[in-house]
Amino acid sequence: MKIIIAPQSFKGSLTAKEATKIISDCARNIFPDSELLGIPIADGGDGTLETIIDATNGKLMNSQVKGPDNSFVKASWGIFNSEKNEKIGIIEMARASGLALLEPKKLDPFNATSFGTGELILHAVKNGAKKIILGIGGSATNDCGIGVAKAVGIKFLDSKNNEVNDNVSNFSNIKKINLDNFDTRLKDIKFEVACDVTNKLCGNEGASYIYGPQKGADPEEIKILDKNLLYIGNLIKKDLGINVLNIKGGGAAGGLGAGMVAFFGAKLKPGVDIIFETLNIEEKIKDANLIITGEGQFDISSTYNKAPTAIAKLGKKYDIPTIGISGSFGDGFEKLDKFGILSKTTLINKISSLDDNINNAKELLKVASLEQLKAIKIGMNL
């Protein structure tokens, strides 16, 4: 029997790698003669960087770059070799340009810059990356990726050919996008952007109106931010010949989705699709007899491009049953049945506090895994 152990991280308590090892040890205990394959999984959100580096035996790097407020931050990123021996850099923009890097009182979407994310791209290329996977969740910025573009040599000039500064309210002074100093090392680099939203760049469902409030913008400021993104979108169309205003996902990360398409020719794809393709997961699981997955909580959100649901859907394609283990159940957890997670259990086995459950997560996962696996063994013997 071949068993795939493929959990996501249990947020706040266990990494995907830790969860994979615990469940694998339990499976080896109950099914000692089985073939076990551990595949820590992620969907492009928090923890994706470490999960991918662990899964590929890649290298976790740290670089000093500009943060969203132009102060220096130490940002982690990774580099690894794919199974096709392609060197890939993996970057989460939140590490360099994220909301979590700023105190609430310092949130400022007019001045927050994505420049540091561009610096991380350059570090990855300098270290040999031929492809970049960029996760763009959790941004503090609303600059349409102009900071990233500036970091790689693209200039944004006014009517007198002077560079315009990074304040978004000044973007209407930009009259020309100049690519003369664009870093030539990037011309042959492939970019994939993990993007799980469909918001366009501008309008009531765009970057500024939907995400501006969480970045510190009030209603009047949101109008200004949106107006300036519209201006930049039209300028990109005029100077670069690319219409980013109608791109689904263009409004992600304060317009970075649109900027990555315009300046780098990036492809915007659901994060889980990028990760699963990169790790060649479908090929690895298609001859399995059982899949075990898990995450911190199973609820209705688990059905939206989350890694456990994605691997269960692959299992369903090949008639492989999937069982799931989660920290807890939330509203809508039962809907996972139709996605292929046919049996589910939680780590919680007695009345206890959240802190206790988090602190004891390793032991709780061990108990839950053993009980699930023993039930499977009983069923096999009926």
What are these regions (language model features)?
Residues 2-136, 140-382:
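N-terminal loops that bind phosphate or other acidic moieties
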